[in-house]
């Protein structure tokens, strides 16, 4: 069977993990992730909850890989972006009110 070259990436705030390797043509994303050994290196990765993509495009674990694909395993968000925006807007409004009152 023919081999294809792929990469797998997992990023942290201060560093990232990137591994290049060859897999059999026709392999699924999930099989490649398992074969890469990344799940034993980073036990916090849970394929049922972590989102997965190829070059920032969301994909399914059952998708078949192509030559040159880079599988990206995304960490869960630490905070809800909508909640952060709401909090920031409230803080800015409070600061403006304080300036007006001063």
From Swiss-Prot:
InterPro entries: Mopterin_synth/thiamin_S_b (IPR016155), RnfH (IPR005346), RnfH_sf (IPR037021). Pfam families: Ub-RnfH (PF03658). Transmembrane segments: none annotated. Coiled coil: none annotated. NCBIfam families: PRK01777.1. HAMAP family: UPF0125_RnfH. Belongs to the UPF0125 (RnfH) family. This is Protein RnfH.
């Amino acid at each position: 069977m023919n081999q294809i070259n792929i990469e797998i990436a997992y990023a942290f705030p201060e560093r990232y993990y990137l591994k290049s390797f060859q897999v059999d043509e026709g392999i699924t994303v999930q099989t490649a992730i398992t074969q890469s050994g990344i799940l034993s290196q980073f036990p916090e990765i849970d394929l049922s909850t972590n989102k997965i993509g190829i070059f920032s495009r969301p994909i399914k674990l059952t998708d078949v890989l192509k030559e040159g694909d880079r599988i990206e395993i995304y960490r869960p968000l630490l905070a809800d972006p909508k909640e952060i925006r709401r909090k920031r807007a409230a803080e800015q409004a409070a600061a403006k009110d304080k300036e007006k009152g001063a």
